């Protein structure tokens, strides 16, 4: 009892529980969470992607198919036939240029191909400004005469750039959706011997690469081809697929 004769009562309120110490949030430090930026472009072959569907063998890949060197005599004009078995033998004055080792290996095992994606990227070799221009021009046939000068290649269908600058991609206008043309496979040597009309049964077209005349002979750059192709059928032992 207290002095007034009353019995002290106990408070009915709940005793406050002190807040537990907050856990320190784990921040994502730069060392742990970030991924270092990649500044280097790999020029070597990447891992190809392959699959199957509806009787077709699918292949997606990218390859360096051509090294472009300058000439001191005149503008350089090179023609690349768009065929899976691309491997042009070296010669004094070959008609065609280019080589795609992985695509050639796969293409040699099949008789028929069709394209699902196709583009070309220029990779300069000279870090400084190189005078002149580089031109990429796709022709969907072989009957049109190949231009002999750089200016004749320059039109609304071509890509014109400075050889020392990269980052430009050239996409030929070919049918890739739905049911694109099914073409036969053939090696480069047998393909060169065909008439211009018959080449249309094996190739969707040709890429012409032109570069300006230079004061000295130098390597201007590399041409990379990115592609997605589908193939099927058996091949024969000859250069032409059955």
Curated annotation (Swiss-Prot):
The keyword Transferase does not apply. Its main location: virion. Transmembrane segments: none annotated. Pfam families: Viral_coat (PF00729). Residues 1-54 are annotated as: Disordered. One of its GO terms (cellular component) is T=3 icosahedral viral capsid. Signal peptide: none annotated. GO terms for molecular function: structural molecule activity. Homomultimer. Belongs to the icosahedral plant coat protein family. This is Capsid protein.
